[in-house]
């Protein structure tokens, strides 16, 4: 009988087998790592063991829903609302809030780790839908485009707040298969 508040219900997880595979894989990896640390240090405090096991479960859960994000439209079919919610969940719990895709176009950042286990995701979601945030963003325009196109598309005045978030100037500054190189940094 299902006693996990719907966690393993395919309406929620979409693919029980993949979820279990990710959890088991992460548990095995964590247990192997714990054994290695115990051998090196001669033991592991009980609290550390519990935190690592919790992290294995959370990481497995994260990895499953990262797969759902990566394979939405092919292996998985979810509504736009669920895709947005899943994206927010993945971005909130990925390591260092990094944004990176591999050469196949799949988001490949791992779970953030033990420190992320105590994040208050429900509190963040509640805040996003609060009246305070609604009032702040009700006249906000968010664009994802080249900054020159943005400046050519709007007539700004001194009361406008503009936030530009350029990619890092590094060797891995490829975002959604769009490069941002040294000459782009100079243009900016």
Give residue spans per PLM region.
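Class I S-adenosyl-L-methionine-dependent methyltransferase module
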Residues: 1-137
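Glycine-rich loops and low-complexity Gly/Arg-rich segments
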Residues: 112-115, 167, 187-188
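Adenosine-cofactor binding site in Rossmann-like domains, unifying the SAM/SAH pocket
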Residues: 132-148, 177-180
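SAM-dependent methyltransferase catalytic-core segment centered on the flexible catalytic loop
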Residues: 161, 169-188
């Amino acid at each position: 009988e299902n006693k996990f508040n719907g966690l393993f219900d395919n309406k929620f997880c979409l693919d029980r087998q993949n979820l279990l595979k990710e959890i088991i894989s992460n548990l095995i990896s964590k247990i192997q790592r714990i054994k290695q640390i115990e051998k090196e240090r001669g033991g592991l405090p009980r609290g550390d063991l519990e935190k690592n096991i919790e992290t294995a479960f959370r990481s497995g859960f994260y990895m499953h829903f990262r797969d759902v994000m990566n394979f939405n439209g092919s292996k998985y079919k979810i509504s736009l609302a669920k895709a947005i919610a899943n994206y927010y969940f993945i971005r909130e719990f990925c390591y260092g809030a990094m944004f990176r895709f591999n050469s196949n176009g799949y988001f490949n950042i791992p779970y953030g780790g033990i420190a992320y286990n105590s994040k208050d995701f429900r509190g963040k979601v509640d805040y996003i839908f609060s009246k305070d945030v609604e009032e702040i963003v009700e006249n906000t325009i968010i664009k994802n485009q080249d900054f020159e196109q943005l400046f050519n598309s709007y007539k700004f005045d001194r009361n406008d707040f503009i936030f530009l978030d350029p990619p890092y100037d590094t060797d891995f500054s490829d975002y959604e298969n769009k490069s941002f190189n040294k000459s782009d940094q100079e243009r900016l």
